[in-house]
Amino acid sequence: MAIVKVTDADFDSKVESGVQLVDFWATWCGPCKMIAPVLEELAADYEGKADILKLDVDENPSTAAKYEVMSIPTLIVFKDGQPVDKVVGFQPKENLAEVLDKHL
C-alpha cells in the first residue's frame, strides 16, 4: 500500500484500528525529505501488516498539537487508535522496522 496522506479531519478514522506509523512532517523540513524514501520502503515491506501515514503539521496543526509534536519529523506508532511508540528525527529503516515490529 502506498503512503496515505491524512488531515485533521480524517486522522482519527485512519488510526482507529490496526497499526499505523504516522509521519508528522512539513514541506520545508530537510530531515523530513530525507526520511521519505525510507517510509516508501516501509510501506511496501509492511503492506497488509501496518499502514504508513503522513500528516503535514503546517496544514493540520490541531492533530500535531494533540500529540505534542514539537520537532519534526516525529513518527508515532498507533495501535487501535492509541499512540504506543514515538521517535523523533531521521531514523534508518532498520530502526523504524524494529519499532513497528514491537506492535504487530
From Swiss-Prot:
One of its GO terms (molecular function) is protein-disulfide reductase activity. GO terms for biological process: cell redox homeostasis. Induction: Expressed in both aerobic and anaerobic conditions. Residues 2-104 form the Thioredoxin domain. Keywords: Disulfide bond, Electron transport, Redox-active center, Transport. It comes from the Bacteria. CDD domains: TRX_family (cd02947). Disulfide bonds join C29-C32. GO terms for cellular component: cytosol. PANTHER family: GEO12009P1. Component of the thioredoxin-thioredoxin reductase system. Participates in various redox reactions through the reversible oxidation of its active center dithiol to a disulfide and catalyzes dithiol-disulfide exchange reactions. Belongs to the thioredoxin family. This is Thioredoxin. It comes from Staphylococcus aureus.
